[in-house]
A protein has these predicted regions:
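Membrane-interface helix caps and helix-loop-helix hairpins in membrane proteins
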Residues: 208-209, 249-252, 300-308, 427-428, ...
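Alpha-helical transmembrane segments of multi-pass inner-membrane proteins
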Residues: 36, 94, 98-122, 129-154, ...
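Membrane-interface catalytic loops of GT-C/OST-like multi-pass glycosylation enzymes that act
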Residues: 305-309, 382-386, 429-433, 539-543, ...
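Transmembrane signal-anchor hairpin modules in multi-pass inner-membrane enzymes, especially those
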Residues: 1-296, 305-306, 329-339, 405-412, ...
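Hydrophobic alpha-helical transmembrane segments
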Residues: 394-396, 553-565
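Membrane helix-loop boundary segments at the extracytoplasmic
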Residues: 121-129, 241, 245-249, 549-552, ...
């Protein structure tokens, strides 16, 4: 009898799971092929309409009458640039460096290291009055250790890049320096020991007066600039990777702006030389309009010159969208770009976790009277826990997407580490808006990924829902109290926001059409007359939507929401039509990341930090670029079924069956 009861229990559980799975299947199909599917399945038709417009033709050179003459001018400019003295010197120097033997580099490092140690003792025991910095013996020791394997090697730098898995992985996987580029340098450059000795003494002479770490950074920056001017796509990867660490510098926004400008210059030069292409599409047009509004928000403003400088910074960083959309035109480059972002996020998250457990964090970010059991909130390299949380909300869905599409054990371990570290660091920010953003992003991702993930989500939600009354006993008390305070009016942060939003709404009523201009100075100068008691110190509205509405007026907020709507139309349409499961997953992850930040933006002004402003539009551009790359790849492989532009075909692979839906003008479905 006991065996029969067990079998009945197993069957009962199977029936429950099957019922939930069928419900998830039904819900998923309703989402994909219902109103939602119809609403987000017509982006391509709008793109085709825009492609025939005068704006598109002007931007893409379609109205140039004498194309042959224009082409001759471009070729002449390209030849004059490529034959210039500067370019020839650079190519010759690069050839020498790549064909130089590693033992020459080892000689440079060994002599430089010894001289730097000598300088350390000179400064320490002489009467120069200069106190030696610890970087002297650190750099000297690193140089000496690095010189040992180099002195024993017989390979050239090009050989090392070809043969070393680590060097080749960085060169190819990060910078895009493929084998064709490396194989150009085959001959040995000879034994240039005198040059190595002279270079070592020159470096030591410079480090005598300047911190040697500064000299190393200057050389690295110069090398990266040369690399970016050669491969502008590498500039995007370098910028995205270095962005979090710019927060450790004195001027992070200025440094980020310079990196974007250098990459833009490289792209412009390649464009003139016909080495890259520029395609102006519907989304690009909308972003240009929004950027123009932000620029004029710095011209016509209550904030004066500071607002104008802020508007210029916004416009320069917004150009990062066009760099990603036009340089990352292949899935290979897009994968490199995503990996650069996620690898950087691992270091940021790891530092944040270490900071929480081993470094005393700043307690001023938390109301210790209400949350006495929370020691502080991690900031990692960003200096602000809420800013860090936005960064992690953007990274986490992409990490999950790559993990779910990984098959190799090494990649599964690597992406699992990314997910765990990003999630742990996000929790330790104690950012309630960040937590809501992560929850919203993950719910959207799993609900749209497949009906199986919907089933898992529902199965997980049931026990969690039943356990809600007991979460206080299961989870740490500090976590429960922090999360429960989201809607609490007792928390000082919540009270501050409620009062601030009331004052901001009153400002919007009086500046409904034109706004007050961009920047914190514009807000501070006007808000004083509307401030609610206790919120006089506010420098922004703590809401993305209210801030855009207040800064740019009704036109600005409508245009922003329209751009977001177009992004989701573009992304979901491509996700549903794509034959590439990985591409669809990445697009969905990007949309989920944007959705998570938009949820967080309801309670915080996430664009206050310029780095986050850039990263928002970076992920935005990733979705557009991946959709375009996937669309163009399929157009090369498949012939369109119908040329009828009033119809939109959606193909979606589900459980080895292909569903096809045609949505006609009347909105009816034919399955």
């Amino acid at each position: 009898m006991s065996n029969i009861n067990k079998e009945r229990q197993i069957r009962g559980k199977g029936v429950i799971i099957k019922t939930i799975d069928n419900f998830a299947h039904w819900l998923y199909i309703k989402i994909i092929f219902g109103f939602f599917g119809r609403l987000f399945s017509s982006y391509s038709s709008g793109e085709r309409v825009f492609a025939r417009s005068a704006v598109s033709k002007v931007a893409n050179g379609g109205l140039v009458r004498n194309k042959a003459g224009f082409g001759k001018i471009k070729r002449k400019v390209a030849r004059s640039f490529e034959n210039s003295t500067t370019v020839r010197i650079y190519k010759k120097l690069l050839e020498k460096l790549m064909s130089c033997k590693l033992k020459i580099y080892g000689t440079f490092f060994a002599i430089s290291g010894l001289l730097i140690f000598f300088e350390y003792f000179v400064h320490k025991y002489s009467i120069t009055g200069i106190s030696p910095h610890s970087s002297y013996y650190i750099i000297g020791g690193v140089f000496l250790i690095a010189s040992l394997p180099l002195l024993m090697s017989k390979m050239t730098l090009a050989d090392a890049l070809r043969r070393s898995r680590m060097c080749k992985g960085i060169a190819v996987g990060f910078f895009g320096i493929d084998d064709d580029r490396i194989n150009r340098y085959t001959a040995s450059g000879g034994d240039s020991y005198p040059i190595a000795v002279i270079a070592a003494f020159a470096f030591a002479a410079a480090s005598f007066f300047v911190n040697p770490l500064t000299c190393v950074i200057a050389i690295a920056v110069l090398a990266l600039i040369c690399l970016i001017m050669t491969i502008p796509e590498a500039g995007v990867n370098i910028t995205v990777f270095c962005l979090p660490f710019l927060g450790l510098t004195a001027h992070p926004t200025r440094n980020l702006t310079v990196m974007v400008l250098i990459t833009s210059l490289s792209f412009f030069v390649k464009l003139i030389c016909s080495r890259r292409v520029f395609k102006f599409k519907l989304m690009d047009f909308m972003v240009v309009l929004f950027g123009s509004l932000m620029f004029f928000g710095g011209v016509f403003t209550y904030g004066g010159d500071t607002s104008f400088q802020t508007a210029i910074s916004y416009c320069v960083l917004l150009f990062g969208y066009f760099l990603v959309a036009n340089l990352m035109r292949t899935k290979t480059w897009l994968k490199r770009c995503i990996n650069a972002f996620l690898t950087s996020s691992v270091f940021v998250s790891a530092y944040g976790v270490v900071q929480y457990f081993f470094v005393k964090v700043d307690p001023s970010w938390i109301d210790v009277n209400i949350f006495p059991n929370i020691d502080g909130r991690v900031t990692s390299t960003f200096g602000n826990p809420n800013v860090l949380a936005v960064y992690l909300v953007l990274a986490l869905p992409l990490s999950v997407a790559l993990l779910m599409n990984s098959k190799k054990t090494s990649k599964i371990v690597w992406y699992s580490l990314q997910v765990v570290l990003n999630l742990c660091c996000c929790v330790l920010t104690w950012s309630r808006g960040g937590w809501l953003g992560v929850i919203a992003a993950m719910i959207m991702f799993f609900f749209m990924y497949s009906h199986h993930t919907v089933t898992v989500t529902v199965l997980a939600a049931l026990p969690i829902g039943l356990a809600v009354p007991y979460l206080g006993e299961i989870l740490p008390q500090n976590f429960v109290s922090r999360f429960a305070s989201i809607s609490s009016a007792i928390d000082t942060s919540s009270r501050f926001r409620f009062g601030l939003w009331n004052g901001t709404i009153e400002m919007i009523k009086d500046n409904f059409f034109g706004g007050i201009g961009v920047g914190t100075d514009a807000f501070s100068n006007v808000y004083a007359a509307y401030a609610v008691s206790g919120t006089e110190s506010a420098i922004h509205s703590h809401s993305l939507y209210l801030q855009i509405f207040l800064s740019l007026g009704i036109v600005g907020i409508v245009m922003f929401l329209g751009i977001i709507f177009l992004l989701f139309k573009n992304g979901f349409e491509r996700m549903l039509r794509s034959k590439d499961r990985f591409a669809g997953s990445v697009i969905l992850a990007g949309l989920s990341a944007i959705f998570g930040t938009l949820v967080m933006g309801a309670v915080d002004y996430i664009w206050y930090n310029m780095s986050i402003f850039f990263m928002f539009w970076f992920v935005f551009a990733l979705v557009c670029a991946y959709a375009s790359a996937d669309r163009e790849e399929e157009e090369r492989e498949f012939v369109p079924i119908s040329s009828d532009e009033t119809q939109s075909d959606i193909f979606f692979e589900y459980d080895s069956h292909t569903f096809k839906m045609k949505v006609n003008k009347n909105g009816r479905e034919d399955n």
